[in-house]
Amino acid sequence: MERIKELRDLMSQSRTREILTRTTVDHMAIIKKYTSGRQEKNPALRMKWMMAMKYPITADKRIIETIPERNEQGQTLWSKTSDAGSDRVMVSPLAVTWWNRNGPTTSTVHYPKIYKTYFEKAERLKHGTFGPVHFGNQVKIRRRVDINPGHADLSAKEAQDVIMEVVFPNEVGARILTSESQLMITKEKKEELQDCKISPLMVAYMLERELVRKTRFLPVAGGTSSVYIEVLHLTQGTCWEQLYTPGGEVRNDDVDQSLIIAARSIVRRATVSADPLASLLEMCHSTQIGGIRMVDILRQNPTEEQAVDICKAAMGLRISSSFSFGGFTFKRTSGSSVKKEEEVLTGNLQTLKIRVHEGYEEFTMVGRRATAILRKATRRLVQLIVSGRDEQSIAEAIIVAMVFSQEDCMIKAVRGDLNFINRANQRLNPMHQLLRHFQKDAKVLFQNWGIEPIDNVMGMIGILPDLTPSTEMSMRGVRISKMGVDEYSSTERVVVSIDRFLRVRDQRGNVLLSPEEVSETQGTEKLTITYSSSMMWEVNGPESVLVNTYQWIIRNWETVKIQWSQDPTMLYNKMEFEPFQSLVPKAARGQYSGFVRTLFQQMRDVLGTFDTVQIIKLLPFAAAPPKQSRMQFSSLAVNVRGSGMRILVRGNSPVFNYNRTTKRLTVLGKDAGALTEDPDEGTTGVESAVLRGFLILGKEDRRYGPALSINELSNLAKGEKANVLIGQGDVVLVMKRKRDSSILTDSQTATKRIRMAIN
């Protein structure tokens, strides 16, 4: 207060004011500070001082012809004196106002296209709804978030190539546009920006906003998708939050969300197949998300989620070095440990072999709804500081940390046997066994842990075994904090390896991820996910399997038909028929298969009995290992819609209905595609007798040379194929039969096959 009084007294003397405003600054150190280097030392002051002058702005000389000397109010707009050191003229800020009001206008058609991200943001805010403001403690944790809604996911280098190609197409320099998205964006932008007068540099900046994901490490309490982050300053402060619903979604958030759902489904499906890694790769390569190949998205999208990271690891991409346990991301912040195998006894006297981490280590644990700092020694939890949204979330974090600590009292708290299995019916590893056990019920764990009196530390309170807060006592080593623990900020990625069972390890051999860590949460994807792989047909239930199997046969009928006649075993073993087997009652699978295979063999042997529709209908049943029996069936059962439905061997049924007029197949009322051939029963024809002893495979195939006449056919060796000219100038591909026994002397017709091949 004394100082302020003294200053007030000084300021009241006119001499003081004069010294401060009039005298020159001639202290060398000060002059040096403000004049050395090109960097402006006090931009705000400089701006105020410049704008206080009459003509602070320089402009091109041509401006004098365009702008009058005075405006309507008679104020001077430009000075006749030239700018010292350049051939520009000095103009007043009023000249800018005049220009904005009366200057030349250009077409504005390109503005919404160039400033697309801004226009879209304005729309989102216009349609967004802001709710009430709540005051209270905000648990914010720093997370790496996307701050730029509405962007594509190109790498900086890819975006640079696109921008150069769009904005400066004639510049020299090697630009290789390879990815699908690069080519698509370049084409679209070139069309949009024809005759655009906006400065190329501005266009380049705006394109960068649209093409590249920008992330920042920001304190966030609520939603982390980019449409929430763009209003972060409006929705959360130090002690308040305002509820907000965005007025629109952006594709990049939808891609992130749909990618996670697709990756989870794929990992879950791969786990139960014979070769999980090969299956996972096959599915990633054949899946599209919102029309873009999933593998392209994985290469570009930095989303860190367990299933997504497993898919990336399988593709040989680098991922974050943090590891996952119990749905929490662990990052070691200090200390080290060595791993040793140890046998321990549970409270039920069951022996578990666990890999014990020996040594003192500190970790941060970050989950969706809780975060923690964990300090542990060998099989001992030293300290755990947790913060979370609610009691449930805090409990989850405590359970995971207690199991991770490998303490003896945790293992002794196990009641009953541990026999949890994964989706593929394999036993989980011991650490996940323990985790599942206590996630089901942690009462005994918390009761046995022990409690201790606590010191009064600012911002920390204790938590009792029944999860009530306390300022006097707490579970041993466990404290609740008001402050969140920040997510690991580094974007460093490491090389990892993945084994056949989808366990991901770093180069030291530490397991970072495994399928057990993949969340079971099912969401509804925002973008359409198209799983082309037959392994994913069952994701949407039995009906989807049925429809997809028949659609696949129809789509590939040309090749299926040839395999059916030449190499049926290979056809029956196709993985596309695997999902179908789960629909066939277990007891009947082998018998159905034997029956259908016998039927097919008769069709191959007896000319004129080939029936396209019947082959398509029964083919999936032939894929199971066959049982030899003399049983005949008039219908075959499939388990869909919660009960057994039947497919008629001859004729239509609600499950499989072929309309001969429209040539379309409906499966369970859903359209399964059209047959391009005419599978009608054929009438007798001239060619029948001549073509006995030959198998008609299909349409002409040029690889087998020019069409032979019917007379030339006799020269073919058994098993040899040739194109042959029949009837009214039609050409079909035939093969001379390998077995004479199958040549029937009666003239049962081959017409049916001929007609099928021609139409």
Swiss-Prot record:
Gene Ontology biological process terms in this record: 7-methylguanosine mRNA capping; cap snatching; DNA-templated transcription; symbiont-mediated suppression of host cytoplasmic pattern recognition receptor signaling pathway via inhibition of MAVS activity; symbiont-mediated suppression of host gene expression; symbiont-mediated suppression of host mRNA transcription via inhibition of RNA polymerase II activity; viral RNA genome replication
Main location: virion
Xref: Gene3D superfamilies: Polymerase Basic Protein 2, C-terminal domain
Cited Pfam families: Flu_PB2_1st, Flu_PB2_2nd, Flu_PB2_3rd, Flu_PB2_4th, Flu_PB2_5th, Flu_PB2_6th, Flu_PB2_7th
Entry GO MF terms: RNA binding; RNA-directed RNA polymerase activity
Location(s), subcellular: Virion; Host nucleus; Host mitochondrion
Residues flagged as site, Mammalian adaptation: K627
Record flagged with keyword Phosphoprotein: no
Keywords: Cap snatching, Eukaryotic host gene expression shutoff by virus, Eukaryotic host transcription shutoff by virus, Host gene expression shutoff by virus, Host mitochondrion, Host nucleus, Host-virus interaction, Inhibition of host innate immune response by virus, Inhibition of host MAVS by virus, Inhibition of host RLR pathway by virus, Inhibition of host RNA polymerase II by virus, mRNA capping, mRNA processing, Viral immunoevasion, Viral transcription, Virion
InterPro entries reported in the protein's UniProt record: Flu_PB2_2nd, Flu_PB2_6th, Flu_PB2_C, Flu_PB2_CAP-bd, Flu_PB2_middle, Flu_PB2_N, INV_PB2, PB2_helical
Motif Nuclear localization signal per UniProt: ranges: 736-739
Gene Ontology CC entries for this record: host cell mitochondrion; host cell nucleus; virion component
Function (record text): Plays an essential role in transcription initiation and cap-stealing mechanism, in which cellular capped pre-mRNAs are used to generate primers for viral transcription. Recognizes and binds the 7-methylguanosine-containing cap of the target pre-RNA which is subsequently cleaved after 10-13 nucleotides by the viral protein PA. Plays a role in the initiation of the viral genome replication and modulates the activity of the ribonucleoprotein (RNP) complex.
Sequence similarity: Belongs to the influenza viruses PB2 family.
Description of how the protein assembles with itself and partners: Influenza RNA polymerase is composed of three subunits: PB1, PB2 and PA. Interacts (via N-terminus) with PB1 (via C-terminus). Interacts with nucleoprotein NP (via N-terminus). Interacts (via N-terminus) with host MAVS (via N-terminus); this interaction inhibits host innate immune response.
Protein name as it appears in the record: Polymerase basic protein 2
Native source organism of the sequence: Influenza A virus (strain A/Swine/Iowa/15/1930 H1N1)
Name of the encoding gene: PB2
